[in-house]
A protein has these predicted regions:
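Active-site metal-binding loops of divalent metal-dependent hydrolases
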Residues: 7-11, 50-53, 82-84, 111, ...
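Core catalytic region of metal-dependent phosphoesterases/phosphodiesterases
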Residues: 2, 15-115, 173-186, 208-217
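Conserved catalytic scaffold of divalent metal-dependent phosphoesterases
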Residues: 9-16, 69-70, 87-176, 180
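Structural motif
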Residues: 3-5, 47-49, 120, 160-162, ...
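Short, charged, surface-exposed secondary-structure boundary motifs
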Residues: 87, 117, 189, 221-226
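Short, flexible loop segments at boundaries between secondary-structure elements
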Residues: 187-202, 219, 223
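Short, solvent-exposed loop/turn segments at secondary-structure junctions
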Residues: 56, 168-171, 198
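Short loop/helix-cap segments at secondary-structure boundaries that form the rim of catalytic
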Residues: 113-116, 201-208, 225
């Protein structure tokens, strides 16, 4: 068994928003994803760090979920990204996956999963692009509550945290999220969201005792990052 992570697959098999139009590394990205997942074994776990489908509803994203479900891996843990407009309550999503026969898809939201003694925790997170104030402050506070709920669910196990948004970026620090990571003893943090020229500005490596890693699909050349066996 092995644990992998990748984010920002931006699938659009049912909607007209293919990422190929951006050129560069995104050309033929669906085929690249399929080839990249060849490294994943049938018993492996893959954490998908948000921005998975351009579908506006669960039904519209169904072909994208079918694609993800058919890829190698026993479990794919789905995290919410800022473009996952199909996202719904956990109960509705789990019911939809069950009724659709998507047996490998799981929701990582207010909970955690175990992998080989590690606790896999996470939430969407927060980024400086989203201004705070009024409604945004409520959303930000909910994200903190969700992350803490996930970390608490892990108990005393060593914790790996998966976010969509980077908690660090150039001079930006989401201090409230970083404080939670330190308080609960998170040792490794994986995130997506950044594309293109933003890759070179990403926080990668150890900072303040936590190992940070960018796992956006285009950064990884569409091959999931192996975290551990």
């Amino acid at each position: 068994m092995a644990l992998y992570a990748i984010g920002d697959t931006h699938l659009s098999l049912s909607s007209n928003k293919p990422m190929d139009v951006f050129g560069g590394g995104w050309e033929g990205y669906v085929d690249k994803l399929q080839k990249g997942f060849a490294a994943v074994g049938p018993e492996d776990t893959v954490v998908l760090c948000g921005d998975l489908s351009w579908g506006m509803s669960l039904e519209e994203a169904k072909k994208d979920f079918a694609f993800l479900d058919a890829l190698p891996g026993a479990r794919k843990l789905l995290l919410k990204g800022n473009h996952d407009y199909w996202w719904n309550t956990a109960a509705k999503m789990n019911r939809f996956f069950a009724e659709s026969g998507f047996s490998t898809l799981r929701i990582l939201h207010n909970n955690c999963y175990e992998y080989g003694g590690y606790a896999l925790c996470g939430t969407r997170g927060w980024f400086y692009e989203e201004e705070r104030g009024g409604h945004s402050a409520k959303i930000f506070n909910r994200e903190l509550i969700r992350l803490e709920a996930s970390l608490k669910a892990a108990g005393e196990r060593e914790k790996y945290c998966f976010l969509h948004y980077p908690p660090l970026y150039q001079g930006y620090r989401c201090q409230e999220i970083l404080d939670l990571l330190h308080r609960y003893g998170v040792t490794r943090c994986f995130y997506g969201h950044l594309h293109g020229g933003s890759h070179r500005l990403a926080a990668v490596g150890e900072q303040d005792g936590i190992q940070f890693r960018l796992v956006s699909a285009d950064y990884l050349r569409f091959q999931p990052e192996k975290i551990c066996d």
